[in-house]
């Protein structure tokens, strides 16, 4: 086995360690709450009615939390469609060229009919040498997944998966339901935590689980609250984690709110128009992940045309293919109008959650 293949296998194996840790904590919390608290402590003290109410509410939060977590982990990241790949002849010409200017000319012609409005910082076509494709707007190469991810937000070790266009809604719901889960557990355990702490209750075995359950749920609540608040702010601004650290550069300059259409429309881009699906971990996000409306809509007829097509693309339900609009109908006048591309600049993907040093997004004149 080649060293690089062995190393990648080790990476994939180690990547499941954080997921197994979270799974262990969740399974233990289920046992501690259901068995030690509700069955032994509450029922043992004649509080059967309260135990039933607690169990019903607990399982509601537990099911939604596990469902969202599962979807975040096992939803495959969406990658660019074949329209963004170079043809065999274009790829052959590109590989034979030693001049970066000539390579960029080949990429520019290939990207002319694609709905692309972003470039690298040096005004070059964003091309992934590893995947051998032209990157759509907001797409980036993830070194951990070894593929280009549509609307990549970050690679999250706690789910061992890339968070992007296909599962960003699931990730937000995972944070939301984990927050509610921890809050519910902490608030309902608190009074028994006090009783065990003051030795009013003397069950030694249940005491350990109840005391530890309160500390763990409170700790995770504080941690998840800060992370969820940050991502809610990102959704309201229509930014990814990558874009929050490096604002996209448009034809008029750097603008961190370049993709923002207003708070309401920004939220609907992630959660969709159907309110009945908002709190369910099923795919309902707007668009196809390959093109996104910007604040240029209304002033640039070409951009408006692309945006209208993107708005009409919907997919509801998990594990369904994402509809791709006919790219040939969306000629990119921005790329076509630029007569010359500057020297190519490199661009890296993101390999970990919360990093700030990988991506530049820009739009050419």
Curated annotation (Swiss-Prot):
Transmembrane segments: 15-35, 54-74, 170-190, 208-231
InterPro entries membership: Palmitoyltrfase_DHHC, PFA4/ZDH16/20/ERF2-like
Reaction catalysis annotation: L-cysteinyl-[protein] + hexadecanoyl-CoA = S-hexadecanoyl-L-cysteinyl-[protein] + CoA; L-cysteinyl-[protein] + tetradecanoyl-CoA = S-tetradecanoyl-L-cysteinyl-[protein] + CoA; L-cysteinyl-[protein] + octadecanoyl-CoA = S-octadecanoyl-L-cysteinyl-[protein] + CoA
Lumenal side: 36-53, 191-207
Subcellular location per the Swiss-Prot or TrEMBL entry: Golgi apparatus membrane; Cell membrane; Cytoplasm, Perinuclear region; Endoplasmic reticulum membrane
Residue sites binding substrate per the record: 135, 140-143
Domain DHHC: from-to ranges: 126-176
Residues the entry annotates as binding Zn(2+) 1: 128, 131, 141, 148
Region (Disordered): 301-365
GO biological process: peptidyl-L-cysteine S-palmitoylation; protein palmitoylation; protein targeting to membrane; synaptic vesicle maturation
Task performed by this protein: Palmitoyltransferase that could catalyze the addition of palmitate onto various protein substrates. Catalyzes palmitoylation of Cys residues in the cytoplasmic C-terminus of EGFR, and modulates the duration of EGFR signaling by modulating palmitoylation-dependent EGFR internalization and degradation. Has a preference for acyl-CoA with C16 fatty acid chains. Can also utilize acyl-CoA with C14 and C18 fatty acid chains. May palmitoylate CALHM1 subunit of gustatory voltage-gated ion channels and modulate channel gating and kinetics.
Domain comment (free text): The DHHC domain is required for palmitoyltransferase activity.
Family assignment from sequence similarity: Belongs to the DHHC palmitoyltransferase family.
Protein name, per record: Palmitoyltransferase ZDHHC20
Native source organism of the sequence: Bos taurus (Bovine)
Lineage of origin: Eukaryota, Metazoa, Chordata, Craniata, Vertebrata
